[in-house]
Amino acid sequence: MSKPIAYVLSTRELSAVLVEKAAAKGVVIDSLAFIAIEPMKVVDLPGASAVVVFTSVNAVEAANGSGWKIFCTSGATRRKVVKRFGEAAIAGTADSAAELAATIVGEGWVKAVWFFCGDLRRDELPARLKQAGIQVHEVVVYRTRLTPQMIGREYDGIAFFSPTAVESFFSANRIPAHTRLFAIGRTTAEAIRRHCDNPVTTSGRPDAELLINQIIHDNTEE
């Protein structure tokens, strides 16, 4: 491990590989989860040939089926879809839920989708699809519970991975104006800006590794 040059808080657990990668560059990452995921039992699942939509890894992990045509967000969600259902199952991807909705509408042939999601899902995707006349069957497969807690020190940077985690964090904490903030995507960045004026760096894609790489870069290239 290099001599520490920055201390960063991740608001969700990260893999040991990413934490060690950052530490090797002198960026010390503490992980503290601000939300908890509780899987739900699902009885009504779509049959083969259904068009299925995923915008989170948690939703993919809770789904079981075959023969689906799958639209999903990129990054970790896409990788999980490939692992569980195979590359051939993917009908389209995009970097955000809003962009994914536009992709689905743009296909022109989709009449109905099964949207696997959590109980606190955002409205961009289903609203856009319904507006375009596409029927949306929502399948709630997990609950998201906020777990706010006060942090015990100041950090040089804080990484956020969902708008819900942002709400949980700021319900219990205030941060100095100099703290750098990092967001996994645009909706998460927008949630941060509702709570503070600190500068926010947004990952190019919804991918934890890309975000950690950005954090390392921002703390070592000055």
Regions inferred by a protein language model and the residue ranges of each:
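Signature of uroporphyrinogen-III synthase
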Residues: M1-E222
